[in-house]
Amino acid sequence: MTSEASGAAPDGADESSVDNYSRKRRVFVREVAGAYSEIYRQLGERPRVFSERDVAFKGGPQHFVKGVINPGRDAGTQLFECHIDVYVPGGHGQRHAHMNSAVFYILEGEGYDIHDGRHHDWKAGDVCIVEPGCVHQHFNASAHEPARMLVIKSKPLFIFAGLMHQRTVVPEPTNPVPGWEDFDPTAVGTDSRREAQSR
């Protein structure tokens, strides 16, 4: 068993640098078994529309995530997943790399990514692509506004094929951005937030 599979620190990393990636329980592939006609019928009965409001945010204090579509939600797909990410003003996420590609559609805010040491600016309406194996990190460049993005990954397909290596280079920050200790990611992108700003 590798150190990552056991939850221990990978070679060359201390115990404090290991995030919860290797410890978090996931559904990688749902069982597909039975008569073809029955499986096909069940597929047609699965939901086609999902509300992000039905899923709670996880993470923090600088980066929050909610998994909207993935194999574990019985969404009728096992090839990709999508989640909503929110970054606190001035916040950032972990620096990491994975074998699957990923697409980030910026819904709100502005910031930048570092991909293999190169700086890439982004803003609402942009699409950012991370290629397989790229060491990357996301940053919210605004000190006053949160950043929100829709992330689409082919991770379930890669995991099914055994291409599941992921490495955290720098873990998620554990301290909140000063002044944003009580940040509520559920208010981002909602009418209540816009109303509060207009007061």
What positions do the PLM features span?
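A short, N-terminal "cap"/entry segment at the start of jelly-roll beta-barrel domains
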Residues: T2-Q78, H165-R199
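Conserved short histidine dyad/triad with adjacent acidic residue
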Residues: V65-N70, E81-A97
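A short hydrophobic beta-strand segment most commonly corresponding to one strand
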Residues: C82, V103-Y105, C128-V130, H144-L163
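Glycine- and acidic-residue-biased ligand/ion/polar-headgroup-sensing regions
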Residues: V88-P89, N100-G111, G117
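A generic "binding-loop/recognition-motif" signal
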Residues: M99, R118, C134-V135, K155
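Short acidic-glycine-tyrosine-enriched beta hairpin
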Residues: G117-G133
